[in-house]
Amino acid sequence: MESCITVIGERDVVLGFRLLGIQHTIIAEGKDLLKKFLEVFQNPQCNIIIVSENVKNMMDKRTLRSVEISSKPLVVFIPLPGVREEETIEEMAKRILGIDIGNV
């Protein structure tokens, strides 16, 4: 069974990742963004989902919590241009892996 990395988001974001060689990409905006994200999130072959941070605002609290604690697939939100990232790499590692890399 092949595992995959999938990128979901606005056209500019997705095209950038295609240039980096990621084959599984989905261009989606608006309501379609959440729909496509949930389809990929439920796919057992997908290991990593890189998605536009816009999708966070569309999720209900239960779905967002499920996504935040998921390690397979691991979901990485792409910050919106001009918006400061909320979660640092150290915080993400602690949340997902349960380890504190800030004091290493």
UniProtKB/Swiss-Prot annotation:
Keywords: ATP synthesis, Cell membrane, Hydrogen ion transport, Ion transport, Membrane, Transport
InterPro entries, sorted: ATPase_V1-cplx_f_g_su, ATPase_V1-cplx_fsu_bac/arc, ATPase_V1_fsu_sf
Keyword ATP-binding: no
Pfam families in UniProt: ATP-synt_F
Membrane topology listed for this record: Peripheral membrane protein
Gene3D superfamilies in the cross-refs: ATPase, V1 complex, subunit F
Alphabetized SUPFAM superfamilies for the sequence: AtpF-like
UniProt-listed GO biological process terms: proton motive force-driven plasma membrane ATP synthesis
Subcellular location: Cell membrane
GO cellular component, one term: plasma membrane
GO molecular function: ATP binding; proton-transporting ATP synthase activity, rotational mechanism; proton-transporting ATPase activity, rotational mechanism
Family per similarity comment: Belongs to the V-ATPase F subunit family.
Quaternary structure and partners: Has multiple subunits with at least A(3), B(3), C, D, E, F, H, I and proteolipid K(x).
Function as written in the Swiss-Prot or TrEMBL entry: Component of the A-type ATP synthase that produces ATP from ADP in the presence of a proton gradient across the membrane.
Name of the protein in question: A-type ATP synthase subunit F
UniProt organism field: Thermoplasma acidophilum (strain ATCC 25905 / DSM 1728 / JCM 9062 / NBRC 15155 / AMRC-C165)
